[in-house]
Regions:
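Short, compact, well-ordered microdomains
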Residues: 54-90
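N-terminal domain-onset segments
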Residues: 1-54
């Protein structure tokens, strides 16, 4: 079976800590969605979770999850363990 290696790509990411800085994180996601011209509702911070609407449906980030801005400007959450295995700080 063929194997593939992930291309080295630099991404932007912020950790969701469910604290006062979460307002800034929500603004960052919403500003990015607006800049891309994506017709989805705004991200919201509800009951300690961050809800990120995407064209595929809502994604929920919990405390400690990383919010990634992908290569196409899309936003999605990533669990801390997966993030640590996949990314390193540049």
């Amino acid at each position: 079976m063929p194997q593939f290696k992930k291309k080295p790509v630099i991404i932007e990411a912020r950790q969701f800590n469910n604290d006062s800085e979460s307002y800034e994180l929500v603004h960052w996601v919403n500003e990015g969605q607006y800049a891309r011209g994506v017709d989805v509702p705004f991200a919201t911070w509800i009951n300690g979770n961050l809800i990120i609407p995407t064209l595929e449906g809502d994604h929920t980030a919990s405390t400690g999850d990383w919010i990634i801005k992908g290569v196409a400007g899309e936003f999605y959450p990533c669990k801390p363990g997966i993030f640590e295995q996949t990314y390193e700080k540049v």
